[in-house]
UniProtKB/Swiss-Prot annotation:
One of its GO terms (molecular function) is microtubule binding. Residues 10-39, 48-80 have a biased composition (Polar residues). It comes from the Eukaryota. PANTHER family: KINESIN-LIKE PROTEIN, KINESIN-LIKE PROTEIN KIN-12D. This is Kinesin-like protein KIN-12F. Residues 761-791, 872-942, 1038-1081 form a coiled coil. SMART domains: KISc (SM00129). Residues 104-436 form the Kinesin motor domain. GO terms for cellular component: microtubule. The gene is KIN12F.
Length: 1114
């Protein structure tokens, strides 16, 4: 099959088209394949058993070396170190048991046979060897007598075993030029398409991939009830002069190395081909090796001048028969590294060759530096990332050198006296690399890990969408998401996905032949009779109910499952509203009891090797789940927070309303879930998540309702808990509220203050009546005083001595004046205490002044002194009282100011507390919004998961219906067969029936072959169409990427053009300024010339001289 496929897909004429002329001329098959030039690096080594006349000069030395290697001790050592061919891989437990003996870094030395005399390699101990009186530690040494199959058994078989176990593996071929590195790794180009044989010349890589694919097929066959899927992809790159090139797609050159947390270290835009057989890998190897850079050196005229790395990734998925998704996923990487040796070409010393040799020596020296630093590291397995980034080779081999990989270093040496220095450096490199500490791990992801990482993936997807949205909105930025760089990356991903879509399953071309004989027919007849007898016996033991549905499916593990819808649906459990989880558990337990009872009965029935066939009816059609609304907070709950007493008063009722609405919505959700709870066993996780969500919805309402609210009363500025019977305050500012609180007239409904006001009014009325009586007395006294003063004036005029004595009337007048002043003072004091109008006070003062005037008019000159003394006393009293009033007013103002300051401070503190409370409320509101969004997301995902469950069950229902129809068809066919057999038995023509049955089967086989051929043709045409569409999509993507690049170049050119235009405008402005300056200078010069006093005759010679100079210049 494999040969036919290769011959059909790749003809012999085109096999050599991948190779250059210089290489293909040497590697084409000939009559004597051993007669190739031994100076070529990829040529097979010379067999010492074949006679060669060129070796006669050194025959004695070579025979001595041959005799030493053919000694029984050496033969026993070689046979002991050579493992036998492994027919099947060991299990994972055996691999772990051998982990102690299997080192993570293995060093193997292979010796290339030489024509000249070579020095000896002595084995000192199990892992120690002596070369020219120096001891080295290696895992094994392969001498020149061992062939390619021995190298594969030593290196390749453990590598394939580790790769299929989930480990990363690497093989690094190191050595000088002409030591056989390329031959050991790849073998001759013509041997890749040969059949594998122990004595063949196939290299290590082809043998590894042949065994790998054969073991994959064997694992698929041995999987039993498990479903095992494998997917392999391959990439091939070259490092030449410090630049990375793609050997599969040669248009991809100068590629960059990227390092991120998701993909690790990878090469950008590197082609990865999906392969499913060894032939695909062989084509990639032939194409890549034909494009590798080769050149002539001092040791061989065709030597590798570049490093090549072949990366092969194996992904496997294991899925059990009972599980719905994959249980484990393994990913392993195989890196095959072929390094170029540092050799000079003495004949050709051009600049290109010198630069080539410089880069090779630099990369190898950087590799040696990394190996030395890792070997001397105190903590093995821990490597500095900056250490590996010194060159492309060490950067790509970061995981292989001191990382998560099992490394095998193949040191190829050429033991001759000419290259002793390079041989010893190769051995020292292998010994240092042996001391590196790699930490390989099994790259396996289980189902539990996937469940744990699902939330992280969801969050990362949200962040990615946000980043993409931000990148799309940022127009004109350099890091645009739709730039040419990102477009190129998306094109590469599209190409990978197209290659993956082309991976169609293979068609099994094995032809099935059905041969029918009379003996087979007799055996079938006996089996039918035995089954009929056992069926009748079981019918007697177990009566079958025709109405119920009893359909059993026997799986690959021998387990039986029963779907009894009538019995499961008949058991209904009453679900209480307050205990949703217990109802689910009760329903689940009831369903499991029914299933277990029916399962035990069926297992007893099946255990006795009998089959019961009963007519099946279709089960009920699965209904879709009822759409349940997610618990959202209404818009009228708390959109904003107002710092008022009314909002604080209504907070309890608001919390109650929130709680009632959430309770109603939770009841609605429960009822919807109760109605959609069809498959209880599969919805346990959904019920648990919804139960937690309902608890979260119900619980946050309690702290919101228990918050204590605070109100500001007008009586005293203290924080008091609110009461339900408080009156709403008027919408006034705090200052107006305080002023209104001080006025007793504003206070309503306070009896104590009203009584005080009435008492004060009565007192004021009494004072007014007393003052009115005093005023009347004063008027009477004034009248009497007038009469007395007239009499006294007459008496005084008649007196001669001019002295007078104060009379009783004068004393009485003085007492009246003082009494009026006291009444005035009392009235003033009362006016301060009372709320008299200003008009009444002025009227009283006017009356007092009128009285004073009336008193002053009748007073004569003799009473001037008395009046002046009385007035002075009154003025003194008034000044003292005024000063006291001013001081009292000042004290009162200061007290009021202090009260206002204290009130403002208290109000400021109150505002700050209310502000902090509002901020806390806003934060809590945001948290509640976030929790509500998370709950909505959880419910949405739960509903989607439930819908997927329903879809899955509908698919199962359709499959079940198909199986029922097939079962009915088989039952009908068996009944017809039974009838035919009975008729043939009665007539005695069994042989004729057998012949007719054979003819029917042959006719069916012919029809099946025709259908198969048609399907093959359709499959081929579909593959061709798929490839054509893939090529068309790829070309369209390439066109789009180039258009994007052209747009970017055009935009860059436009920007440059705009910049040039701006510069031109600036230059034009500068020219205009210079012209203006020049005109001004010319005008000034002309003015200065006009103002010059020299005559014109003196200026004419100068003018003539200038004109002559201008003519000569012309």
């Amino acid at each position: 099959m494999a040969d036919n496929r290769i011959a059909g897909s790749l003809p012999t004429s085109s096999k050599w088209s991948f190779l250059p002329k210089s290489v293909s001329s040497h590697f084409k098959p000939s009559s004597n394949p051993r007669s190739s030039n031994p100076d070529i690096e990829n040529a097979p080594p010379q067999n010492p058993n074949i006679h060669n006349p060129r070796n006669q000069s050194v025959s004695s030395k070579s025979t001595a070396y041959k005799n030493q290697m053919d000694s029984p001790n050496c033969r026993s050592q070689v046979s002991a170190s050579r493992p036998r061919a492994i027919s099947a891989l060991k299990t994972r437990n055996e691999v772990e048991e051998e982990g102690a003996s299997n080192p993570h870094v293995k060093v193997v030395v292979r010796i290339k046979p030489t024509k000249e005399y070579c020095w000896k390699v002595k084995k000192v101990s199990k892992v120690s060897y002596s070369v020219r009186d120096r001891h080295f530690t290696f895992d094994s040494v392969l001498d020149s007598n061992l062939n390619q199959d021995d190298v594969f058994q030593q290196i390749g078989v453990p590598l394939v075993r580790d790769a299929l176990s989930g480990y990363n593996t690497s093989v690094l071929s190191y050595g000088q030029n002409g030591s056989g590195k390329t031959y050991t790794m790849w073998g001759p180009a013509g041997s890749m398409l040969e059949d594998p044989s122990p004595k063949g010349e196939q290299g290590l890589a082809p043998r590894i991939f042949q065994m790998l694919f054969s073991e994959i097929q064997r694992e698929k066959i041995k999987s039993g009830g498990k479903e095992v899927n494998y997917q392999c992809r391959c990439s091939f790159l070259e490092i030449y002069n410090g630049q990375i090139s793609d050997l599969i797609d040669q248009t991809q050159r100068n590629l960059k190395i990227k390092d991120d947390a998701k993909n690790g270290i990878y090469v950008e835009n590197l082609t990865e081909e999906y392969v499913d057989s060894y032939e695909d890998v062989a084509q990639i190897l032939m194409k890549g090796l034909s494009s590798r850079k080769v050149g002539a050196t001092s040791t061989s005229f065709q030597s590798s001048r570049s490093h090549v790395i072949l990366s092969f990734i194996v992904e496997s998925w294991n899925k059990g028969a009972s599980s719905r998704c994959f249980n484990t996923t393994r990913t392993s990487r195989i890196n095959l590294v072929d390094l170029a040796g540092a050799g000079t070409n003495e004949r050709d010393a051009t600049k290109h060759c010198v630069e080539e040799e410089k880069f090779l020596k630099k990369s190898l020296s950087e590799l040696g530096h990394v190996v030395n630093s890792l070997a001397e590291n105190v903590h093995p397995g821990i490597s500095d990332r900056s250490l590996h980034k010194t060159s492309c080779l060490t950067h790509l081999l970061q995981e292989s050198l001191g990382g998560n990989s099992k490394l095998t270093i193949l040191c190829n040496i050429f033991p001759s006296d000419k290259d002793t220095k390079r041989t010893m450096s190769t051995l020292r490199f292998g010994e240092r690399a042996k001391a590196m500490g790699n930490k390989p791990m099994i790259n396996e992801i289980s189902e539990e890990d996937v469940n744990d990482l699902s939330d992280q993936i969801r969050l990362l997807k949200e962040e990615l969408s946000k980043v993409k949205a931000d990148a799309c909105h940022s127009v004109g930025s350099k890091n645009d998401y739709f730039g040419a760089k990102n477009a190129r990356e998306s094109l590469n991903q599209l190409r990978v996905s197209l290659n993956r879509s082309l991976m169609l399953p293979k068609i099994d071309n094995d032809e099935e032949e059905i041969t029918v004989d009379e003996d087979d027919f007799k055996e079938l007849h006996l089996q039918i009779k035995s089954l009929r007898g056992s069926f009748n016996q079981k019918l007697k033991k177990f009566p079958v109910n025709r109405d119920s549905v009893n359909s059993s499916f026997v799986t690959a593990f021998g387990e039986s499952e029963l779907m009894d819808d009538d019995e499961i649906c008949s058991e209904e459990v009453e679900v209480e509203e307050n205990d949703f989880g217990e109802s689910l558990e009760e329903h689940d337990s009831a369903a499991t009891v029914c299933k277990s009872s029916e399962k035990s009965r069926i297992e007893e029935f099946v255990s006795e090797n009998s089959i019961s066939i009963s007519p099946c009816r279709q089960s009920l059609i699965l209904q879709e789940p009822i759409q349940s609304e997610s618990p959202k907070f209404r818009d009228s709950l708390r959109k904003s927070i107002a710092l008022s007493s009314s909002c604080l008063r209504n907070q309890n009722s608001l919390a109650k309303s929130i709680k009632s609405t959430c309770f109603a919505e939770s009841q609605h959700i429960r009822s919807s879930l109760r109605g959609s709870k069809i498959f209880t066993g599969s919805t346990e996780s959904l019920a648990a998540s919804l139960r937690r969500g309902l608890d979260i919805i119900d619980n946050p309402m309690n702290p919101a309702s228990n918050r204590c609210s605070v109100s500001l009363s007008s009586d005293n500025l203290t924080m008091q808990p609110p009461t339900d019977d408080r009156l709403p305050l008027s919408p006034l500012c705090p200052t107006c509220r305080i002023c209104s609180s001080k006025l007793p007239s504003v206070v309503e409904g306070d009896g104590y203050h009203m009584e005080g006001v009435l008492e004060k009014q009565q007192e004021l009325e009494k004072l007014c009546s007393e003052q009115a009586a005093k005023i009347e007395q004063l008027t009477r006294l004034v009248g009497q005083h007038k009469l007395q003063t007239e009499d006294e004036t007459e008496k005084l005029m008649g007196a001669s001595n001019g002295e007078r004595l104060p009379s009783a009337n004068e004393n009485q007048l003085l007492s009246c004046i003082t009494e009026t002043y006291d009444v005035k003072q009392i009235s003033d004091d009362d006016s301060k205490k009372t709320d008299f109008d200003i008009g009444e006070k002025e009227a009283l003062l006017k009356e007092i002044e009128d009285l004073k005037k009336k008193l002053q008019t009748p007073v004569t000159m003799s009473t001037n002194e008395l009046r002046s003394s009385l007035l002075a006393r009154s003025f003194q009293l008034r000044s003292k009282n005024a000063e006291k009033d001013i001081e009292e007013e000042r004290l009162r103002c200061t007290e009021m100011e202090s009260e206002w300051i204290s009130l403002t401070d208290e109000f400021r503190v109150e505002i700050e507390t209310q502000r902090t409370r509002a901020e806390k409320a806003e934060a809590q509101l945001k948290q509640e919004k976030l929790s509500s969004e998370e709950l909505e997301d959880a419910l949405r995902r739960a509903v989607l998961g439930h819908a997927r469950f329903v879809e899955h069950y509908t698919e199962l229902q359709e499959k079940y219906n198909d199986l029922c129809s097939k079962h009915k068809a088989t039952v009908e066919w068996i009944t017809e067969l039974k009838k035919a057999v009975a008729k043939a038995g009665k007539k005695g023509c069994g042989s004729r029936f057998a012949k007719s049955l054979a003819s029917e089967l042959s006719a069916l086989r012919v029809e099946r072959e025709r259908e198969r051929d048609l399907l093959k043709k359709e499959n081929i045409s579909l593959k061709i169409q798929l490839r054509n569409t893939a090529e068309a999509v790829h070309t369209a993507g390439e066109v789009l990427v180039r258009l994007r690049e052209a747009e970017q170049s055009a935009s860059a050119a436009e920007e440059k053009f705009n910049e040039v235009e701006e510069e031109n405008e600036k230059l034009k402005k500068k020219m205009e300024k210079l012209k203006r300056r020049h005109k001004l200078e010319v005008v000034t010069i002309k003015k200065s010339l006009k103002q010059n006093t020299l005559p014109e005759s003196a200026l004419q010679p100068l003018h003539q001289r200038n004109s002559a100079i201008e003519e000569e210049g012309m």
